[in-house]
């Protein structure tokens, strides 16, 4: 069972690439839109509501200054996969580091390709 958190509803097209693959793999998912910068309490509420569940992987989707991935990883005991959307290669080169560089005790796995992100979830769950 997987939770997907987008920083904004504008990330929906990128999220759909992931959820379409998860559907192919028959992996149940739930989607939320909440910005770590603008709605940190909403993100914490999502994490709190799921803390007693099992078999959760968070996929975080946030571009530009991606605080969401680190915020989720730092405040949850479940794995976090950051799959940031990029408009083009220049955008990726400028913004990828906000997903890659995390403080200690904040493990974020980064997968740039949405299909590979879903495949990583499938393999982690062993399905």
Predicted features and spans:
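Conserved small/polar residues in nucleotide/adenosyl-binding loops
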Residues: 1
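Short beta-strand segments
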Residues: 5-6, 60-62, 82-84, 109-113
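C-terminal binding/interaction regions
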Residues: 6-13, 17, 30-32, 91-127
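Short, well-ordered secondary-structure micro-motifs
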Residues: 15-16, 41-45, 69-73, 93-94, ...
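Short helix-loop-beta junction
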Residues: 19-29
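Short beta->alpha junction loops
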Residues: 30-42
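Glycine-rich phosphate-binding loop
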Residues: 45-84
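Long, charge-patterned amphipathic alpha-helical coiled-coil/hairpin "stalk" segments used as oligomerization
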Residues: 68-106
């Amino acid at each position: 069972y997987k939770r997907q958190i987008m920083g904004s509803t504008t990330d929906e097209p990128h999220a759909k690439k992931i959820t379409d693959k998860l559907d192919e793999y028959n992996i149940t998912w739930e989607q939320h839109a909440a910005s770590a910068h603008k709605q940190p309490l909403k993100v914490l509420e999502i994490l709190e509501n799921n803390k007693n569940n099992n078999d959760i992987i968070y996929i975080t989707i946030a571009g530009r200054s991606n605080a969401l991935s680190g915020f989720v990883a730092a405040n949850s005991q479940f794995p976090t996969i950051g799959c940031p959307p990029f408009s083009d290669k220049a955008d990726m080169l400028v913004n990828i580091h906000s997903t890659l560089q995390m403080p200690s005790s904040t493990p974020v796995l980064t997968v740039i390709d949405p299909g590979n992100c879903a495949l990583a979830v499938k393999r982690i769950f062993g399905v």
